[in-house]
Amino acid sequence: MSASSQYDEFQAMLEQQKGIYLQQNSQLAKYNSSLMMKITDMETKVSELVQENVSLRSRLSMGELRYREKLNTVFQTLEDGIVEKFLQMNQLLTTVRESQGLESGIHDNPLKPILRGSNGISPRSAKKVEFTGANTTTKPVGFEDPIAEDNHENSGNSLELNDDEVRPLRKRRRKSSRRESLFIPADFEFNDEDPELELNQLPITEDEPPPSTAATSVPEEESQENKHTKEEREDEGKENVSTIPLVPVLPSVTNTGTECSNTNKNNTTEMETALAEDDSYNFTTSVIEYSIPEETSTHEHSHILLETSKSKIDVYNDREETNNNEADDSMNIVQCTIPSQSKIKHSMKHPRTKLKGGQDDIMPHTDYDKDDEKRERRTRGKAVNYKLPSLRAKMRRPTEKLVDATTVTDIHDLQVKRRNNQQQGIPSDDDDQEELLVPAGVPDTNVVIATVEEENRKEPPALPLHEIHLAQNVKPKIALKELSANAINRKVKTSTAVKAISHTKSRVLKDVKFNTLPTKQQAIENNSSDPNVSDENENSNVKPTRTKQATSDLAAFEIIDGISLKHVSRTHRVRAKEDMNKKRKRIHNDEISI
């Protein structure tokens, strides 16, 4: 029994231990699976980081490569620009040397000195110049670069500094006419020497400068310098005759030429000596002279300019030309001058502008032109002959003569006073026919108005139309007597009758006739002839005369309204129309009076 119980206990303990181990194993398996999942996540993240790193490295390398390429292009453009500028400067210097007649130096191959870092000239440390009073020492330029030295040996110019180059440069004097009158002692130092003999005696040496001795004095150096400069300028003048192009001469040069041509031979020789001492062809001012065209003419060409230039440039001097062309103009065209007071231009310019000549100005030119003759005067149209009728607007005045529309003369002063002549003379038959027969019943007011009109007719108006005062025409207005009730009624009826008149009749009555109103004697005779007329007959007779009186009174005011300051041009056609209207009015007035 005891053995079986022990076996059961052992079996139970094994089962218990087995369960414990199984539980631990399951926990470990779960833990391992979680770790494996974490490891896989980490691997994916690491792979992503590696890819990002690779992309960043590629971007960085590409950016650096682009930066290097851009920097390379920038440096390349800078180098090309610098080289191009150097080449342009070299070309400018070569053109200046050619224009001055100098030989080309070390600039046969301009790329060599630029690329080798040397322009063919030694550094400044090699130049040593000492001034010991009148003694001058010269030291040749040392060449350290063999290429530059070879180029220097091949070229025909030496770069040694002599006493002419060491001496400080004089200030350049302008070739002006004002300074020719100044006394300069340097101009008169070597007049007794003949420059042609000096030029023939001295040999022309370009490679080697004249050796300077220690015992030479200052005046000898100056004379030697003058000889050297004269030799160079003579050679340059021979070359410049073919090389230098002709430059347009400005008025400053021509003015100096005019004054020099008028001087004596002694003054011309002094000018040549002064120009010979002028340092206008030093290398410091050659570039400036190249850019300024009027300063580039040499002193050898100055005498040519003096001979060919005129005495003065004729800019506003047109009198000689007009004198030369007077005969031709008189043969072709007959000109008639008009006084300035009676003739003005349409533009209404100020009268001061008339003082200027009507001829065109001539532009200044030199004798380098092919045509030395003066050109003819230009006009914008054909010359005008004022004796012929003008082609402009015309007006007709009563004298039937043509008048230009541009005259200043007042047209009212030229009018023919026809009415004054008729009024001062014997009245015509037409005026007698125009007098109307007025019935006997006219009141005394008509007689008063007739007397006033007669007085006005005896005084002819001496003033023109635009100066007539309106107060003269207002005189016939006189206060009438008080009217009775019957007269007021009759006046109302007559006013309505005036409105009923047709347009043609009222229009005829607007024009005033001088002899329509009865005179004082006619009125007295009419009143005295019928003293015993009844009121009915008077009323019946007054009716037509009242109408005529009212229209004639209104016509006096229409004269004032009809006055206009503007003058109507009177032509033959207008006069014919006026005559026809007068005839019609006479016939109409005769019919009314009948």
Swiss-Prot record:
Record field: compositional bias (Polar residues): 252-261, 519-532, 539-549
Biased composition (Basic residues): 343-355
Skewed-composition ranges (Basic and acidic residues): 224-239, 357-376
Keywords: Cell cycle, Cell division, Centromere, Chromosome, Chromosome partition, Coiled coil, Nucleus
Gene Ontology BP term (one): meiotic chromosome segregation
The protein's role, per its UniProt record: Plays a central role in chromosome cohesion during cell division by preventing premature dissociation of cohesin complex from centromeres after prophase, when most of cohesin complex dissociates from chromosomes arms.
Coiled coil: 38-61, 220-240
Chief place of localization: nucleus
Listed name of the protein: Shugoshin
